[in-house]
Amino acid sequence: MARLDKVKGTRDLLPEEMAKRRWVFERIREVFEGFNFQEVLTPTFEYTELFKLRSGEEVVKQLYAFQDKGGRDISLRPDMTSSVARLYVNRFQNAPKPIKWYYIANMFRYEEPQSGRYREFWQAGVELIGSDRVEADAEVIALFTQSYLAVGLEDFTVNIGDRILLDEFAKMLGVEDDIGLMRLIDKKDKMSREEFVGALREFGLNDDGVEKVLSLIEIKGLPDEVLPKAEELFTSEEAKAEIKRLYELVDLLDAYGVSKWVRIDLGIARGFDYYTSVVFEAIAPNDLGIGSIGGGGRYDNLIEVFGGKPTPATGFAIGIERLIPILEWKGLLPEIKLRPDVYVIPIGDDREVKKTAIEITQGLREATVRADIELTGRKLRKALDYAGKLGVPYVVLVGKKDLEAGKVTLRDMKSGEQKSIEKERAVEEILNILGV
């Protein structure tokens, strides 16, 4: 028998959920565009090789990959950064810099569904291409922070780490597989301490190396507390230069007015192999089992890997499936109104009655009132019962006798009161009552 149920890890989004999403998308879009980012949308699927080049081992394992009818290896996009980088390489290498793009789109990963994690999920994000300066990092992290503030979230932190410092740390430990170590550190929050220590030993670290890693991931907190510790730990010129850059980044974020939410966490790696220096993620305390609600970082080598000229870039993605449950849990989403403000009921089967009902409905709609009309031909009592179940505040009754007198009836569904109004002034009167 054919399977006609919903595929595991996906969801049917009903009107109330869609209304919440639309509200969140609108708030985020306003902030993105306020920073002069412009919207783009790439294909839902790309050649699989695009994602295999630098997305990271974990993401590659989770690809929805298949061959099309032409035998080409295709994958649904697991993230947008690779696709946007490909778009840039294909068409915009000679465009004026920086390029500031944003997207709101669905992604696909074959992973185990859990709280805030699905196999089809939505992200809102930006990519800033063409600047290697700390000002670009500050612009992107400030936008990241203000996007959460725009939807009413205030109890969260933006934790900033640095892949250059992690690379340096791997060298200090004598680890050749620095990417492997970063992947392991990135998974630390998904393991108990004992499991993490065991994984470090399996990776080949001795007791001293394990202790150093455990010490590193505890170096986190306010920038003025953490960065001096980093200066003591790292001694190479490259590391010192990067710490100096972090000091400047924090200073610029203060000018943006978002330093209240900023923390430094040297144990952040992020899961994608294409990050090259600054990385960051947002965490909002909750009882829902949801961890990071978004993140990003600088990826200065990815465009070159895709065949383009060396071009610095940075960006982030906000996880919508993680953000919305937290907003609901905190009571930050607005009350969703799905009912119409006015329901128009033509009584009987007379054509002029139907036409008048349509004209009134359309007049209200043109005035931006949410208006609906009875379409099933049911009896008046059943139509009124239906309007009552919807919670409609006002009903317009259009009957043949009233119409012959140039009238229609307006019914207040809460009080049950009815009054006769001029047909020609019906829309105007209803608008006055609604305060439109």
From Swiss-Prot:
Keyword ATP-binding: yes
Protein's name in the database: Histidine--tRNA ligase
An annotated Gene Ontology molecular function: ATP binding
PANTHER family: HISTIDINE--TRNA LIGASE, MITOCHONDRIAL-RELATED (PTHR43707:SF1), HISTIDYL-TRNA SYNTHETASE (PTHR43707)
Pfam families the record matches: HGTP_anticodon, tRNA-synt_His
Alphabetical keyword list: Aminoacyl-tRNA synthetase, ATP-binding, Cytoplasm, Ligase, Nucleotide-binding, Protein biosynthesis
Disulfide topology: none
EC number: 6.1.1.21
Broad enzyme group: ligase
